[in-house]
Amino acid sequence: AEEFAKRILVRDYEEDKENSVMVDSPDEFWAMHAAILPLDDSGVAEVQIDDLGGRINLNNLVTASGEVDPITKDRLTRLFRALGITGLTVDPLIDWMDADDQAISAYGAEDGQYLMADPPYRTGNQPFVSITELRLIEGMTEEIYAALRPHLVALPVSGVGINVNTATAQVLMSLHEDMNEAQAESIIAKREEERFENLQDFLALPEFSGMGLKANGLTLQTRFFEVVSRITYDNRVVNMVSTVYRNPEGQVRTVHRDTGQKNRITKEPYTFSEG
């Protein structure tokens, strides 16, 4: 199932290159459907590819030198506001990642708070390995986590831009202080009619008028994807979620696998015949 998804992503890259338009968007076939692959009379594989490029990468928040990236911090702060999150700030996320043991502010949290938990534990002091680590953050609740999850990702690298063709309304609202929900929904409606194939066209939208929004941290391509697989065979079911990376040359490799997940396949099914 995972290898099938990789082949689909390679083919998508080749088609984009042939058309001289290196853009990833929700109207592409891989993004619209979950593939149904008959194994034999006793089994079936379901495969869904999800774009991770439209989310804010948590690991952009603190640089390799330990400095806080102001653009990412501001975007996360605006995302929290767009989602109506009031019981948590970005500061404990910074403290979770940075190498020191000093809380960044009165709203932060370092080892001192976590060691008083039952059972006690320490901060990560490194980039997030998984988005699920957010559950360990001081002040995090299941309600806040559920609200944040569709808009965030923990990639194994920093510096990956947000794909403006796949960003959610809340992520679009995080791009500038003056962006509101109506403007974000208007942008989504426009890209559903015609995707953005040039960042300058995106930045020139009337919704951004007077904001001076820059292209920093924005892109039209996606490098990381989530492959959701569900195998049913002889009445047994196995679920797996993989993170795959497609490099600028179109090669795709797996960077993370997680088994034991609940079924997360939600897209319209499309059955592939043998071969």
Which residue ranges define each predicted feature?
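Compositionally biased linear targeting/interaction segments
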Residues: A1-G275
